[in-house]
């Protein structure tokens, strides 16, 4: 008899952040600079104390110093930088300390509101600290009293950055060097959530008091047209409604508009803060219950419960003049108001697949 036991999926692989890659390559280049020894791999210590060995693609001298590169391995996470070449060029400096520069494919900060000052290379604080710690320890080990100029680059980074939130955040010319733990956890979506927080922070720092958090391009277009908002005020939240609402607790704005497809908004209305299908589903019986509270007939309720999709349920309700879109927005609005500070004026909008408004609540 055939074994019907499903095969257990292999555990997902963790990977390493661009910050870890930058640390490994800058350490290897600096070691070559001070000792003349070129490594094939280098061990680094991550922020929580783990020691990891990272393989190098090259480690060689240059006209004014040394450089090393590694291929970014994000494990099983769908990271935009997976497979990219991350490299560091290191040169001696007379003054002690480590100074960072943006090489090809690494962006530069041009707007206030991020963790780095305007004009700085987009190398985040934890990667900077990781590199500084390793390079200062190397200098002490070899009795070197000078400092280092460290240039970090990402091959093809300028094109890859167009797939990220960097252009909207005011990071121009390439990617950011990221990471807080040094490790990429598969499908943690931490980088995306961080970009949502950064988007809100940048908007606040630039005097924007009304932001619109949108689930996708259609909802973003609807908000842009409805309010003539600048791009900086449009927050691409995707499925992470909770990331927006919770961040506003510590970084409030005067006014928040949230807009999404009817199905996504119905999940938020039911109390789900992650709107992805992996983490939440559409509750058709709940939609039917809300319709009943608005006077829907028993026949309509039964048809809605039997619907194949939320869009079908919406069309059934619309045909009977039941304002299901407004009802969903009203419930979603209450969920949001329970999270954000009372000082934030919140409103909800739902759109259909053609980008037309099908519900609103204020």
Swiss-Prot record:
GO molecular-function terms, A-Z: cobalt-precorrin-5B C1-methyltransferase activity
Claim: Cell membrane is one of the keywords in the record: no
Family annotation (InterPro entries): CbiD (IPR002748), CbiD_sf (IPR036074)
Pathway(s): Cofactor biosynthesis; adenosylcobalamin biosynthesis; cob(II)yrinate a,c-diamide from sirohydrochlorin (anaerobic route): step 6/10
Disulfide bonds: none
Family annotation (PANTHER family): COBALT-PRECORRIN-5B C(1)-METHYLTRANSFERASE
Family: Belongs to the CbiD family.
Protein name, as recorded: Cobalt-precorrin-5B C(1)-methyltransferase
Native source species: Burkholderia cenocepacia (strain ATCC BAA-245 / DSM 16553 / LMG 16656 / NCTC 13227 / J2315 / CF5610) (Burkholderia cepacia (strain J2315))
Biological classification of the source: Bacteria, Pseudomonadati, Pseudomonadota, Betaproteobacteria, Burkholderiales
